[in-house]
Curated annotation (Swiss-Prot):
It comes from the Bacteria. Pfam families: 2OG-FeII_Oxy_3. 2-oxoglutarate binds at residue 165. Its EC number is 1.14.11.-. Fe cation binds at residues 98, 100, 155. One of its GO terms (molecular function) is 2-oxoglutarate-dependent dioxygenase activity. SMART domains: P4Hc. Keywords: Dioxygenase, Iron, Metal-binding, Oxidoreductase, Vitamin C. It comes from Prochlorococcus marinus (strain MIT 9312). Binds 1 Fe(2+) ion per subunit. InterPro entries: Oxoglu/Fe-dep_dioxygenase_dom (IPR005123), PKHD_hydroxylase (IPR023550), Pro_4_hyd_alph (IPR006620), Pro_4_hyd_alph_FE2OG_OXY (IPR044862). Residues 80-174 form the Fe2OG dioxygenase domain. Its cofactor is Fe(2+); L-ascorbate. This is PKHD-type hydroxylase PMT9312_1262.
Amino acid sequence: MNFLTNQLLIQEEIEALIKNLNKENTLWEDGKKTAGSHASMVKNNLQLNRESEISKKLSHLIKKKILSSPLIKSFALPKIIHGIMFTKSLKDMQYGRHIDNPFMSSGRADLSFTISLTDKNTYDGGELIIEEMNSEKEFKLNAGEIIIYPSTYLHSVKEIKNGERLVCVGWIESYVKSIEQREYLFDLDAGAKGLLAKNGRSDELDLIFKSYSNLLRLLGN
């Protein structure tokens, strides 16, 4: 499984984030400032100044929420969560087809994530398009929902036709770089935990958990 979508934030958390972000109208700046040389040519959005105190505070809260999710930790095996920023797209804004930088000053980008702070029914357009080898997948998230996907995929955000798209984005450096290896480990972990919940502990399950832990040691970096 290369993609993960999950409800990360509850309504009260979403409202608190939006309230804080709406206070900082003077801190929104051209999104091209943090894009690579190629991506900056197709990036048209606004982002909260990453060096501002409110950006640092809210980024810390987002990081804590991600690390509190057992499902996300099993899927992404996060070593470093970094580059968190809040972006806003208004009418006629979009982010054209691009690839994320492999390395940033804060870490390697193995996985990218987007958390929607506005509900998908409050704006038109703005779909996230992710390109696999022979197909495209289109995502439009509920408020508080996160999507995590490989940073190696080309992706884009369609033009906003009406309304406002407010999201939090960031990157994950994983303990395991390989997409395939992460998928095998995720399946093994999910299967073992499912059997534990259904049947309780057993000697056979001990061996499965042992194999999972040792595979993580072998494949991790």
